[in-house]
Curated annotation (Swiss-Prot):
Belongs to the aldehyde dehydrogenase family. AstD subfamily. NAD(+) binds at G220, S221, S222, R223, T224, G225. PROSITE patterns: ALDEHYDE_DEHYDR_CYS (PS00070), ALDEHYDE_DEHYDR_GLU (PS00687). Pathway: Amino-acid degradation; L-arginine degradation via AST pathway; L-glutamate and succinate from L-arginine: step 4/5. Keywords: Arginine metabolism, NAD, Oxidoreductase. The keyword Heme does not apply. GO terms for molecular function: succinylglutamate-semialdehyde dehydrogenase activity. This is N-succinylglutamate 5-semialdehyde dehydrogenase. One of its GO terms (biological process) is arginine catabolic process to glutamate. Its EC number is 1.2.1.71. It catalyses: N-succinyl-L-glutamate 5-semialdehyde + NAD(+) + H2O = N-succinyl-L-glutamate + NADH + 2 H(+). The active site is at E243, C277. It comes from Shewanella sp. (strain W3-18-1).
Length: 486
């Protein structure tokens, strides 16, 4: 069980790949990658199944998607444990991920009707009707940080709209993808409607470049997303939806309850071991005694964050990063900031060789004139002290990204001022910036995306509008146009 093509499981014909539990280094999955020929077979299966899937009608498609929801409910403990083992995230967090997957079904059905439903109006020229049709065959590229929830957020609305799907998950989380597709199979999805191909860069390239796909929905790094954008620049007939990363700012101004502010900072910067695209990377704190007090409390709180394996009891706040390589990358990022003039307030350390376990870090980078505009994808927060609110907003906007941003402030006027000037697709006030609603769009501007917001707006890129003017019979107008005679 590695690849799922035309309703059947197949072993790969490529090279061996394994999945490692990053918290202990144990191998938990083995398989072989899909070759270009197997990718082609998956696309052909999706193409052959697409029209019949569309012609089933929305209600019949929804019934199968709701059967998938029932499968998620029945298997939520196994799915949460699989996500925890493969990503290193603690069990409490993976349980919430599965809950979000279950909730996505109702949200996607509501979004289908609200964003891409059918509307008819009588006009003097006839009945004007707006309908939406699926693009056809779409590829979904999933990330490792939310290997269930994020691809699910593409797959469910794509299927509801009448598309067929080829799912290519992260090579770091193949076991989660295999279980997800198993549940789709148990839900009764017709053969060819969803297909799974596992692999690394070569598999992804074979799928992304296939001439018979009509669209690609990607969640992942800005670098890969930009390469896909360049590749698709000459293909205006294909829909491309990119959800990429961010170098996200969080500003603190005039907050009396500093303990509550510190809590929101921790949730913004360190949840999921800093491996959420919306995590705060830069923290702006006012100069002065109030800011000093907040930072002192923050330093103490960061030092007390519990880190441990996915199954530790009592449960930790932070689990493992996705790999030892990722952990070493964060140590290197911290060293780079220190070389530029940063000052350690709390040192990020690699806790155990052979694992992705790291402690959270906090670096004062106020003395660095120009911060690297990089998404350090881990639990490393950069602190900047500021003296003027306008200066803080200006610094916050000094990034090519534009995913999430936040303000913790007691003044509504300060928030209105901030909201009008900050450049980001997700802007929160007095809430963690890693908190997003599935009933709202999710996406950013700049290097964070290509104006194809997901979540509630995913329906928008899963279908295209069809405008019609209709009448029940052919009829002559009351008056012919000048120059005509009949």
């Amino acid at each position: 069980m590695t690849h799922y093509i035309q309703g059947q499981w197949h072993t790969g014909n490529g090279h061996d790949v394994t999945s490692i539990n990053p918290a202990n280094g144990e191998t938990i999955w083995c398989g072989k990658t899909a070759t270009a020929e197997q990718v082609n077979a998956a696309v052909e299966a999706a193409r052959a199944a697409q029209f019949d899937w569309f012609m089933l009608g929305f209600d019949a498609r929804l019934a199968i998607v709701e059967a998938y929801r029932s499968q998620l409910e029945a298997n939520k403990a196994e799915l949460a444990e699989t996500i925890a083992q493969e990503t290193g995230k603690p069990q409490w967090e993976t349980a919430t991920e599965v809950g979000a997957m279950i909730g996505k079904i109702a949200l996607s059905a509501a979004a289908y009707h609200k964003r891409t439903g059918t509307e008819a109006n009588d006009t003097p020229a006839g009945r004007a009707v707006i309908r939406h049709k699926p693009h056809g065959v779409v590829a979904v590229f999933g990330p490792y940080n939310f290997p269930g929830h994020l691809p699910n957020g593409h797959i469910v609305p794509a299927l509801l709209a009448g598309n067929t799907v080829i799912f290519k998950p992260s090579e770091l989380t193949p076991k989660v993808a295999e279980l997800m597709v198993t549940l789709w199979d148990k839900a009764g999805l017709p053969a060819g409607v969803i297909n799974l191909v596992q692999g690394e860069v070569d598999t992804g390239k074979a799928l992304a470049s296939h001439p018979q796909i009509d669209g690609l929905f990607f969640t992942g790094s800005s670098r890969t997303g930009h390469l896909l954008h360049q590749q698709y620049a000459g293909h205006p007939g294909k829909i491309l939806a990119l959800e990429m990363g961010g170098n996200n700012p969080l500003i603190i101004k005039g907050v009396q309850d500093i303990k509550a502010a510190v809590h929101d900072i921790l949730q913004s910067a360190y949840i999921s071991s800093g491996q959420r695209c919306t995590c705060a990377r830069r923290l702006y704190v006012e100069q002065g005694e109030q800011g000093d007090a907040l930072i002192a409390l923050l330093v103490d709180a960061v030092k007390q964050i519990k880190v441990g394996p996915w199954n530790a009891q009592p449960q930790p706040f932070m689990g493992s990063m996705i790999s030892e390589t990722a952990a070493k990358g964060m140590v290197a990022a911290q060293a780079n900031l220190l070389d530029l003039g940063g000052k350690v307030l709390v040192e990020l350390t690699h806790l155990q060789a052979g694992t992705g376990l790291v402690s959270p870090g906090l670096i004062d980078v106020t003395a660095i004139d120009v911060l690297p505009d990089e998404e350090y994808f881990g639990p490393l927060l950069q602190l900047v002290r500021y003296g003027d609110f306008d200066q803080a907003i200006k610094l916050a906007n000094q990034t090519r990204y534009g995913l999430s941003a936040g303000l913790l402030a007691d003044s509504r006027e300060d928030y209105d001022y901030f909201l009008a000037r900050i450049r980001a697709g997700i802007v929160n006030w007095n809430k963690q910036i890693t908190g997003a609603s599935g009933a709202a769009p999710f996406g950013g501007v700049g290097a964070s995306g290509n104006h194809r917001a997901s979540a509630f707006y995913a329906a928008d890129y899963c279908a295209y509008p069809v405008a019609s003017v209709e009448a029940d019979a052919v009829s002559l107008p009351a008056t012919l146009s000048p120059g005509l005679s009949l």
